[in-house]
Amino acid sequence: MSETYELKAETRERVGKGSSRELRRNGLIPAVIYGDKQPPLSIALSTKDVTMKIHAGGFMTTVATIDVDGKKIRVLPKDYQLDPVRDFTMHVDFLRVKKGSQVSVQVPVRFENEEKSPGLKQGGALNIVRHEVELNVSADNIPEFLTVDLTGLKIGDTVHISNVELPAGATPVITDRDFTVATIAGRTQEVEETEEVTEVEGGEEEA
């Protein structure tokens, strides 16, 4: 689990596009805290502080504390919007979380020991099907990432979610199947399949 942190915020009295633009001009980000059967709370945060946390990594999997005018609220980031042109943070949504509460989180997947995979050594390719896995997990036990060990994997092998070690008490949101996280594909096979498709398409055009 990533190390928690605290952000200072102030309550927003006004909402709407005009108010949000004014906040951004003053170096602040509009945000909302919702959940826990309480009314949504509109707040403003330092653009610099939030941007630093986002770029540091683990932002969406780290429980934080927001000090709103002296009142500390425990939250988990659920969404944020970036300006498509200038790439700065436009808005953030936070979910209130209590101690031990269950949350649904998209957790990044990391792959290790590629050099110990016979399939990759033979020229195979790591085909990543899921870069993230959505988990139901305690807010106090959210992993920063899930680790997939590629040791011993050969061409044609598949890594299913059942092969991935999850934190205690965590379960995948998808429960109706043992879904694929990654496979070791053969490059030669991929080339042959591409050539076959090209030949078929060429034959159809001639016909």
Swiss-Prot record:
Keywords: Ribonucleoprotein, Ribosomal protein, RNA-binding, rRNA-binding. Gene3D superfamilies: Ribosomal protein L25, beta domain, Ribosomal Protein L25, Chain P. One of its GO terms (molecular function) is structural constituent of ribosome. One of its GO terms (biological process) is translation. Residues 1-21 are annotated as: Disordered. One of its GO terms (cellular component) is cytosolic large ribosomal subunit. The keyword rRNA-binding applies. The keyword Ribosomal protein applies. It comes from the Bacteria. Part of the 50S ribosomal subunit; part of the 5S rRNA/L5/L18/L25 subcomplex. Contacts the 5S rRNA. Binds to the 5S rRNA independently of L5 and L18. This is one of the proteins that binds to the 5S RNA in the ribosome where it forms part of the central protuberance. Belongs to the bacterial ribosomal protein bL25 family. CTC subfamily. This is Large ribosomal subunit protein bL25. It comes from Sinorhizobium medicae (strain WSM419). The gene is rplY.
